Amino acid sequence: MHSNLGLAGLAGLLATASVCLSAPADQNITSDTYCYGQSPPVYPSPEGSGTGSWAAAYAKAKNFVAQLTPEEKVNLTAGTDANNGCSGNIAAIPRLNFPGLCVSDAGNGLRGTDYVSSWPSGLHVGASWSKALAKQRAIHMAKEFRKKGVNVILGPVVGPLGRVAEAGRNWEGFSNDPYLSGALVYETVDGAQSVGVATCTKHYILNEQETNRNPGTEDGVDIAAVSSNIDDKTMHELYLWPFQDAVLAGSASIMCSYNRVNNSYGCQNSKTLNGLLKTELGFQGYVMTDWGAQHAGIAGANAGLDMVMPSTETWGANLTTAISNGTMDASRLDDMAIRIIASWYQMNQNSDSPSPGVGMPTNMYAPHQRVIGREASSKQTLLRGAIEGHVLVKNTNSALPLKSPQLLSVFGYDAKGPDALKQNFNWLSYSPAIQENHTLWVGGGSGANNAAYVDAPIDAIKRQAYEDGTSVLYDLSSEDPDVDPTTDACLVFINSYATEGWDRPGLADKSSDSLVKNVAGKCANTIVTIHNAGIRVIGDWIDHENVTAVIFAHLPGQDSGRALVELLYGRANPSGKLPYTVAKKAEDYGSLLHPSLPETPYGLFPQSDFDEGVYIDYRAFDKANITPQFEFGFGLSYTAFEYSGLRISNPKKSPQYPPSAAIQQGGNPHLWDKTVTVSAEVKNTGRVAGAEVAQLYIGIPNGPVRQLRGFEKVDVSAGETTQVKFALNRRDLSTWDVEAQQWSLQRGTYRVYVGRSSRDLPLTGSFTL
């Protein structure tokens, strides 16, 4: 890493979250010069090394780029218009048989086209806690992208991580925990790219709110994008962590975000791009802007930006001019082009790939070629994925599974299907608290997807009723419906919506809560299903004696109803666990409930100070000793599991810092050295088979009480016992040393906790380093 700051000066800047200095307290500053220097400069931009599995792709790319004219190199670095419906395009170079690139939304399935599937969302996969599911979903989903001529998936999402409870895009990512997010993004990147489609992991980095995410104008006054101000320790231990796992898995591209980081825009921040991503993590692919996130010309290129989407007004011929006048090295343009072409070769897209955009019509309602993306082989993964992301959080007196009901009463707006499915479904110009006209199976914005169909809960319930001879009464519009007193169960469906572009107006809504309470006041067996695009607090009615069962159904995709009925009737056993903490009341999230808003003196340059450090979600609840409604990692089953036999291996003797080594993709390879192995036994003590997520938490000296550092989802037959093992590597047991700029093992006693959730940990032990 090269910088014009010495190590001591660098560490000083990074030790605490950055803020603008010496600003007047009583009036808005009108220049961001107060904020200069808060993000350390790191230059030059390192060239891709072609390390490890990238060697062959880099050799081919260098040969390819050597044949390009300056104009052709420049054209690779910015999007262009094309006669297709791709989100973005890179122009072809016909004389060298390069067909161009089609990049398209998004990480939860293709958007804006036909003959594709609506997959379970990232949050839904996070709630499954299944690495195997994450990989299979990625494989089958990527096959649809490939058949439709998409070279690059604009996903998966690990930013936002979920710092702000009301953040509008938390549903696109996997979890509020970096370890869980990192494990699932690794499988997602690995799975998608195994079928020859590149991933663009996003949004890098600290894109933790939608409010003021972009610069804007209010009453004719320019307002900058919000600045996420963070210290180096928190950056590494929380927000960079899952991106490191994505790079380790070989993500071909990283999308830089709209926001500023320590008062430097994310797509021209040399510290995050040159320093962290390309130097420390050894990233071999290319950095792509989010749409319209370019705010600088040559400065952005020098800071590590490689590709602008969807087009550029500041690069083009200006890049070659900059090389001519010496403000940019020719090697930087070469590296940009090499990284892009190397990723194309790395995905083997030079061989037998569909034409870019072949199945992406500009208008689905105009004549176009039929290109089928869906495959019959995906059906099992679609349904399994939909099932496993449901989390059962209450089940009084075994209300579920249903037992041959004679009469079911169904209530709530969320039970019914949509009136229409369109090309850009669920892109709204505002963010309502709920989708009151139909069931919620996906969130809004660019992360939405196109469904082949939507199996709504009421439709699936009717099909099952036909098979069983059950009567079904329903009222899907009233807030205070009539209830037949002889009904076996009342099924109430509500939702909680979220979308790109807006943060949520709250974590609950009065009309939905009133519906639940009104039904529960008349029905002794009220079962509530919530399709939630993020945290939903339910303290208003969760303790009602007639609310017997509650399911967080998240965003299951097109097989929503079918999956739910499998669970309601016991043909599938709930196995999901919460990937976030549900508070008893919204105020328990404290300062991390709402997004940061512009305040004097920074009204024109909004600031969001990450002063809480690593203490978000369950770490914050543990630190403040707040009892949640349902803790991180919690989820019920139709059976029960018993834990025993904790074993901890003797730790491998290791120096405080990892030995020096050539940086590979993912960083210093010694970070992955195995240090300790923990094992335990899980017994199914119930009468039916089920799947349990065994969770390992570590208490690192001088750190939070507990941090997730392992999980395994295991299927266990009734009465059977299985062993789970957790292999802990050096990074798992380290904290970030801001002075040494290294991951550091701590000297002292490490606490070990194994169990069902972050607060139900029957097995405890320790080891010493």
Swiss-Prot record:
Keyword field contains Hydrolase: yes
GO-annotated cellular components: extracellular region
GO molecular function terms listed in the Swiss-Prot or TrEMBL record: beta-glucosidase activity
Compartments, record wording: Secreted
Positions annotated with a glycan in the UniProt record: N28, N75, N262, N318, N325, N437, N546
Keywords: Carbohydrate metabolism, Cellulose degradation, Glycoprotein, Glycosidase, Hydrolase, Polysaccharide degradation, Secreted, Signal
Main location: secreted
Stretches that traverse the bilayer: none
A Pfam family of this chain: Glyco_hydro_3_C
Classification via Gene3D superfamilies: Glycoside hydrolase family 3 C-terminal domain, Glycoside hydrolase, family 3, N-terminal domain, Immunoglobulins
Enzyme Commission (EC) number: 3.2.1.21
Catalyzed reaction equations: Hydrolysis of terminal, non-reducing beta-D-glucosyl residues with release of beta-D-glucose
Keyword Secreted belongs to the record: yes
UniProt superkingdom: Eukaryota
Pathway, per record: Glycan metabolism; cellulose degradation
Function text: Beta-glucosidases are one of a number of cellulolytic enzymes involved in the degradation of cellulosic biomass. Catalyzes the last step releasing glucose from the inhibitory cellobiose.
UniProt similarity note: Belongs to the glycosyl hydrolase 3 family.
Protein name, as recorded: Probable beta-glucosidase M
